[in-house]
Each structure stands twice: as structure tokens, then as C-alpha cells.
Amino acid sequence: MHFFSAIVLTCLASTAVAYPALEQAASSAEFKEYQKQEKRQTLGFDAASQIVSTTGDHAWQAPGANDIRGPCPGLNSMANHGYIPRNGYTSDAQIIAAMQAVFNISPDFGGFLTVLGSAMGGDGLGFSIGGPPSASLLTATGLVGKPQGMSNTHNRFESDQSITRDDLYQTGNDVTLNMNFFQDLLNSSLPKGWYDIDVLGNHAVKRFQYSVANNPYFFKGLNTAFIPEATSALVTYLFANHSAACPAGCLDATNLKSFYSVTGSGSTLKYTPGHERIPDNWYKYPVGYGVANVFADMVTVYSKYSNQAAFGGNTGTVNSFTGLDVANITGGVYNAETLLQGNNLGCFLFNGMEFFMPDLISNGGVIGDVSGVVSSLTGTITSLLAPFNCPKLSGIDKKAFAIYPGWNDGKPRK
């Protein structure tokens, strides 16, 4: 998670630009330069514990006609390798275990993501990684509606400014990979042939600016604001191969394409929805990636936004971005001047989510026991924030959100 002083992306070419050199392995000199520039300390290497199996029970299989796949490359790849059910419907316990087994996402952060995703797109006990599941897959009782899956969680879990997907209210499709956005990401690493946190952070900023310039309903609120920037960090560190040759983790075009279900090179790039794949001979992050990592990486990404407000949205026309006044909506507990200091950013975003949960879950129209799920979520957030000595936030002034037509209190899309 980071930010910027990037060039405004006014438009993307409709035809992918060919950069065949990007597909070639970096030279030894480039590799050493990459390692020198990589700020993250080498965390050690243990082949036996880090290798992720792609054989036997975890051999890649294309999804069947009735299998569900969605917008998240990590979830799709885990389903295609059988780390979560190949049908694309996972229980909370299954996904927490799988995220640790494949990506070494620690149970604290993995548990938070799971509980949040299950509440926003599932039945509170599990969820579809894509669209609505069949009734036979559901396990919860007391539901008042049909879960819509992770593909239908706009402004509740999924957000505008995805690094590879369109904004929902701009094109109506926030699930399928936009090859122009992906090509832009591929091209951005050309000078050194690798992808690091600066490359992904700068790409996130360009996507932010593209959304502002093209989506009149672009919105980036508190409850989803961490998603685009978290994605930048997760792709950088968790899609990288932490091998003996590069224990700090190196992410190249080959591995990036594998996780995003893209094949070919240059002008022959091809995206096949739902065919995401864990690369062979791939070693996961060496230690648990947890909330402390998320907080630190978010500051790295958000700092790239320089003086441009990172929260808020367009007010019904393109290029009408109006930022949220952090001090105003938090009663002065947080402010723009100190938001990137210490753990303030993480505390603000995670703590601020609590005040949106009742409406988001209720307006989802699925879970009957709203108070029970809210209690579970707030308890999880409280536990996560306990080590960070966060300032006490007593509420969020939601009236400030009324000017944003892209904000919908988490109501299902029509």
C-alpha cells in the first residue's frame, strides 16, 4: 500500500503495446540491482516449508462448467489447485487455512479478510469466490436473502480503482481483467524487468487518476479504501517467488501472468478468465504476512499520493474529485497532517470500518442476524488493533458522504 506523484493517465491505448524484452529473464547484473534496491530485509529461506505444491492433489485443473470463479486471482488460483474447493465455494475455515498454506497470510489478517468477505458476499460462514452460489452449497441458517458472492460486493468489499479491473459504474463489469490495465502494469517494470512495491504503488496511483478522469461515480471510502493499496502490496510480496536465488522475493512477468491467467507475450497476450495458476517451483513468503505488514505497506503506497486526497470521490461528473476531510469526519481524532505517521493510517481505516458494518450488512439483504455478524467483525477488528495503541474513535460523520453518488451504503447493485 503506497502513493505517489504519477502522470495522469488520460487514456489507455486499445491495442496492447508489444514489449518482448519484458519476457526475457533479467540479467545477473539486473538481478543484483533489483536486490540492492529492494528495501525489505531478506527473511531467510527454507525450501521444505516454503515450496507450494502444484502436483498431485494440488495439480492445476481448469474450472468445470459449474465451477465458480471471480475477480480475485489469488482465490481463483487456490481453487484451480484444490487448496479451497474447486467448485469455488469455500468455508471460512477452509480459506483461512488455504491463505496461510499458499501465501503465508497470517491467521490474524487472513481471518479478518475472511470474516469481512463472508459477511459482505456470503452467508456469514462461507462465500462464493465469484457469483451467486447454488442453494445446496449454503450452510448458514436464518438467511433473509440469497448470497451474491464476491463478484457482487461493490462498495462493501470490492472497490473502484482495481489495478486490473474496470470500475463497476463505468463499464458495468468489475470482474473481468482489463487487458489494457494489465499491459500497462507489465510495461511499467521494463527498466529493470522486475515488479516491486514502487512499480505496483505507482500503477495504483495511475489507476486512481484514470478512475477520476473517466468514472463520474468513482468513490473511495473508508470501508474499502485499503483494498487497492493492499492489493499493490499483496501482489508485490505474495505473488513473488521467494526462492533460494531471491529469498527476499522476486516477481517477474512470467509469474505475474500466471497468477492473472494471461499467456503469450507482447502483442499475443491472451487472458482466459478463471484459469489463474500458481507457478511451478514457486516458494511462498517466508514468514506470516500479517496486520503489521499491511499497516506498514499501506503507508508506503499512500505516501505516493503526495498532496492529492486519497479518500473521497467524484460528485457526478468526471474530474470532480472531492476529498473527504479526515479531521471533520473523525471529530479531530485523525487529520491529514498526521495520518501517515506511525500506525495512524491503519488504525483509521480499520477502526473506521466498524461504523459502517451495520448498514453494509443490513443493506446486503442476506444475513438475518446482523447484530451477531457485526459483533463478530468488531471483535475481530478490536483484537487486531489491540497491539497498535490506536486513538479511540467514537464515530464517523456519515453526512459527509452524501455528495458522492457512487456511495450507496452497500446496497446490492441493480
From Swiss-Prot:
Heme binds at C72. Keywords: Glycoprotein, Heme, Iron, Metal-binding, Oxidoreductase, Peroxidase, Signal. The keyword Nucleotide-binding does not apply. The keyword Zinc does not apply. This is Dothistromin biosynthesis peroxidase dotB. Induction: Expression is positively regulated by the dothistromin-specific transcription factors aflR and aflJ. Dothistromin biosynthetic proteins are co-regulated, showing a high level of expression at ealy exponential phase with a subsequent decline in older cultures. Its cofactor is heme b. One of its GO terms (molecular function) is metal ion binding.
